[in-house]
Amino acid sequence: MFHRIEEALEDLKKGKVVIVCDDENRENEGDFIALAEYITPETINFMITHGRGLVCVPITEGYAERLQLEPMVSHNTDSHHTAFTVSIDHVSTTTGISAHERATTIQELLNPASKGADFNRPGHIFPLIAKEGGVLRRAGHTEAAVDLAKLCGAEPAGVICEIINEDGTMARVPDLIECAKQFDIKMITIEDLIAYRRHHETLVTREAEITLPTDFGTFHAIGYSNSLDTKEHIALVKGDISTGEPVLVRVHSECLTGDVFGSHRCDCGPQLHAALAQIEREGKGVLLYMRQEGRGIGLLNKLRAYKLQEEGFDTVEANEKLGFPADLRDYGIGAQILKDLGLQSLRLLTNNPRKIAGLQGYDLEVVERVPLQMPAKEENKSYLQTKVNKLGHLLNL
């Protein structure tokens, strides 16, 4: 059904188009992807004729800074936080919409002599800024395109177009398979691209290891840094986790208010304590404490979100009101830490199916979801209900 990453890279180097699919629990779609360095009017025409989606150009932040490409909006409320810049046309184009002129704009975007003033705004080419770290940081088509370009040794920019069926519906995997067969195109998944990069790259470093006695038992604590940002994470390991058997794991995102101050607004503190106690009882397991405060928006923004909740917004609406998606967490670094610990098969302590999908995308097998439900308090009943209704959490309330 799917091709190897190496096969896709060979075709991309020849100027061909490939199809890249993401996870069914994310956008669940496929995009045509080509290298921007080799773009032609013919490739653009193929994409708009058979893809029917929006033609975008994933680039690095360096390109955006050099060409003064500002964000399209000041508050991005897109559910996947896709980083659109202002759209552009090269000044040499007329309307900018033809396949030839769109190709010209893309070619000039890559021209090292180009300046911001060489592009009209708005236009018909939509640059997207890829996250530093690529698909290991964000498992999206934007990052996949830039990663593929880098792996090909080309300029770090791609051209992508969503694939839509003739009836206007989004093409899903069965449709994409037929499309790939019809046009003899290689088809890969972002999950496989992540696995390929993980096999060839390491982004986390063990910095310190100690014995940590706690109220719940004694753990082996390992501190990690990573090359994507300045955040430091810690793994608390219990027992021998090198046997190859599935290991009980809790991936816990930092919550200062709940973990330290015992806030009743959430169930984070009780979940943390219950997870440590359960790992201690089993005599083997890992609690990975990730510095992703407030589902990734940070402490101060979490407090601002709490203020909005006091005004009647729920937890998802509050995030969106502040310009954030409902959940900004990524699992790439956490997955690398778990892999560094030698884990392959997990029994995951979680109520969040998205966390399962997030980790499985990084070559970790979740063989069992172990529920971690805490008794609801009067102050967090509404919060927990929103997690069920809008975030898909598996709770019995």
UniProtKB/Swiss-Prot annotation:
A GO cellular component entry from the record: cytosol
Positions of region (GTP cyclohydrolase II): 200-397
Active site positions, chain numbering: 327 (proton acceptor), 329 (nucleophile)
The organism's place on the tree of life at top rank: Bacteria
Binding site for Mg(2+) 2: 27, 141
Site (Essential for DHBP synthase activity): 124, 162
Keyword vocabulary terms for this entry: GTP-binding, Hydrolase, Lyase, Magnesium, Manganese, Metal-binding, Multifunctional enzyme, Nucleotide-binding, Riboflavin biosynthesis, Zinc
KW Membrane (keyword) present: no
Cofactors (names): Mg(2+); Mn(2+); Zn(2+)
Function: Catalyzes the conversion of D-ribulose 5-phosphate to formate and 3,4-dihydroxy-2-butanone 4-phosphate.
UniProt-recorded name of the protein: Riboflavin biosynthesis protein RibBA
Native source organism of the sequence: Bacillus cereus (strain ATCC 14579 / DSM 31 / CCUG 7414 / JCM 2152 / NBRC 15305 / NCIMB 9373 / NCTC 2599 / NRRL B-3711)
